[in-house]
Amino acid sequence: MTTTTSSTRTRTGLDLTDVTLTFGDGDDQVAALDHVDLTVAPGELIAIVGPSGAGKSSLLAVAGGLTRPTSGSVVVDDTDLIGLSPRALATFRRDHLGFVFQSGNLVPALTALDQLRLVEKITGRRAATPPEELLRAVGMDQHAGRRPGRLSGGERQRVGIARALVASPSVLLVDEPTAALDRRRSHEIVEVLAHQTHEFSVATVMVTHDHDVLEHCDRVLEMVDGRLRPA
């Protein structure tokens, strides 16, 4: 397979319009998302806070094309995910969307650098920014040869952020990146996330319960009972 370089694309960010996600039928129907509107511009870091069960995880799943909404539109780079076939959606998600999970979700047998190289191998494209430079950008270049078992929780999250940027995503969806981290490391992780969001012009949505780190975000929204409002 021929390896190519990630192509330049026009970034328009993320736009959710009148998105509803319901479960159940009739009187038992529950709205996880209730007519949600959300626009995130390239280079903008949005934090979403709110109680457990408010719909934050459902919002990330819909925005990432992992769950199909009951109604509404989910547009990334002028493409409505709702209109794509499953195969086209999988390809689009790979090329335009990045995910960072609270566990880091790294491959135990691979070094930090090889975590990033694996993405290049899977996609068949060289990263627009070399993996070595991405690790340097998140302060992990000195630990490039270490496997996850020899990294702290904060270090694993840094690698997870770098890995998510390998495919040059237009939209980055981040779920509780500071969970189980102490206060200092929590601030460090969100500072890194904010810097990379601005540096690479990524539209980033971060779900968090950690109010201490909100100062690093461009906007903060609160989700209550499936609805978004300014925090």
Spell out what each predicted region is:
Residues 64:
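Helix-to-loop junction immediately C-terminal to a conserved catalytic motif
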